[in-house]
Curated annotation (Swiss-Prot):
It comes from Shigella dysenteriae serotype 1 (strain Sd197). NCBIfam families: ATP_synt_delta, PRK05758.2-2, PRK05758.2-5. Its main location: membrane. One of its GO terms (cellular component) is proton-transporting ATP synthase complex. This is ATP synthase subunit delta. PANTHER family: ATP SYNTHASE DELTA CHAIN (PTHR11910). The keyword NAD does not apply. GO terms for molecular function: proton-transporting ATP synthase activity, rotational mechanism. Keywords: ATP synthesis, Cell inner membrane, Cell membrane, CF(1), Hydrogen ion transport, Ion transport, Membrane, Transport.
């Protein structure tokens, strides 16, 4: 867990509550995702760790984000800058996504495979995970050649490793013990 998670929670909650009230949850998530990416830029990271006045820092950050932020999200950026918390934006995004998932009774499920999966395979995985987690799932598919064959499924703390690589690693552990 990140060191900013506790700091990020109230900002995420305020942003989420505002987004729900104004029926703009998707838009807010997109704005936060963009702003979080901006904080990862090397030049911006230097500005964030520098000694700029909060007002100057906020306006510089907002200028970089441009049209990606609306007036309300710019206000969030200003408040976070005043409190020296712009570095926490990636964690604010993470907490916002979590609040949205809880609100919508959905779960993010990562599916990692060596090759692209068919729609039928994805439908089976989705149905099985919805049954297991008792909620709707959103599949995030990734291709990783090191998996070799099979799939690795991650949902929160749960990991189902059905990959050949995982089986070989478990076999090696058994043989070494």
């Amino acid at each position: 867990m990140s060191e900013f998670i506790t700091v990020a929670r109230p900002y995420a909650k305020a942003a989420f509550d505002f987004a729900v009230e104004h029926q703009s949850v998707e838009r807010w998530q997109d704005m936060l995702a963009f702003a979080a990416e901006v904080t990862k830029n090397e030049q911006m990271a230097e500005l964030l760790s520098g000694a700029l006045a909060p007002e100057t820092l906020a306006e510089s950050f907002i200028a970089v984000c441009g049209e990606q932020l609306d007036e309300n999200s710019q206000n969030l950026i200003r408040v976070m800058a005043e409190n020296g918390r712009l570095n926490a934006l990636p964690d604010v995004l993470e907490q916002f996504i979590h609040l949205r998932a809880v609100s919508e009774a959905t779960a993010e499920v990562d599916v990692i495979s060596a090759a692209a999966l068919s729609e039928q395979q994805l439908a089976k995985i989705s149905a099985a995970m919805e049954k297991r987690l008792s909620r709707k799932v959103k599949l995030n598919c990734k291709i990783d050649k090191s998996v070799m064959a099979g799939v690795i499924i991650r949902a929160g703390d749960m990991v189902i490793d059905g990959s050949v690589r995982g089986r070989l690693e478990r076999l090696a552990d058994v043989l070494q013990s």
